[in-house]
Amino acid sequence: MCRFVIYKGTSPVQLCHLLTRPCHSIINQAFDSRLRLDRRRPINGDGFGVGWYDCTYDQELGSQPCIFTSVTPAWNNVNLTRLAEKIKSPLIFAHVRATTAGTLSLDNCHPFQFGKLMFMHNGGIAEFPKIKRRLQSYLPDDLFNMVNGNTGRSIQLRKLPNAYAKTFTPDQLRQAMVETIAEINVMTEEAGITEPSLLNFCVTDGESVVATRYISSRTDEAASLWFSSGTTFNEFAEGGHYKMSKMDKRENIILIASEPLTFEKADWMEIRTNHMVVVTPKMNLLQIPIIDKYYVPPSDPASMNRTTSFAAGKGLLSPRREITAETENCPAISI
């Protein structure tokens, strides 16, 4: 039942406007999820992480992202609160974790960094231990030696482009995610695994962003994923009530999140199951289908009849698709 949020903007934003100040910030989602309900792990308290790129390039510092992780609950980490008030970035990844695979350790806290690239994921590979050994045997030495955790991130690394290249294209990152998903499907099928895998992957090079919403099933919904875009994202009422404003046709800000950060229904669009979102360096947002045997085109009535029970049972989707409020400060909204 992990959560993540991505910010990409033409101007840098303080981390606190994503992490701490909104009444439904990702930190609040760690203990007060409204969209995803998981009776097994109701709290995302198994660590957190935030990664960001510098506002301007510095030759001495390089182009790699900085990542801060901890195994403590995000809402109880005073250092995170302090950093969030003092750091600005035009591209931010943040993640709160509820462990489903692997131990409670820094090595398993998202996001992860490999050269210039940063990535994180949500969901899980079905019966991952059955393919873990085979997967690791495919890794080249440099990747094998850097993977210390055991959450399945090694399969993402395998298909990524050269992390030390100076530049990447959005299509390179998009293709890497397509190939990653295809390889997972081949491995699970050959291992006789029939349970679907829920694969929400995110990767960035600091310029482009790719995020997938995917499930290896033609009849089930994938884990939730939303996006919001506009010209400003700010607090419009006391108590951490934020909204996305659209002053013109420009996209100055793009947010991608497991669960909306605001209770403004008009702010958010749901990403279709078995699609990916690609954000280009020029802030163009593309929603692209992941076409394989599990893809159901929107023209097919079956695309409207995917069931929510599987993802809901994993705590990755609400069966009602409703955010409910239990306090006066956060009004209810159906999505």
List where the protein language model places each region.
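Conserved short alpha-helical segments that host acidic/polar catalytic motifs at enzyme active sites
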Residues: 1-121, 125-335
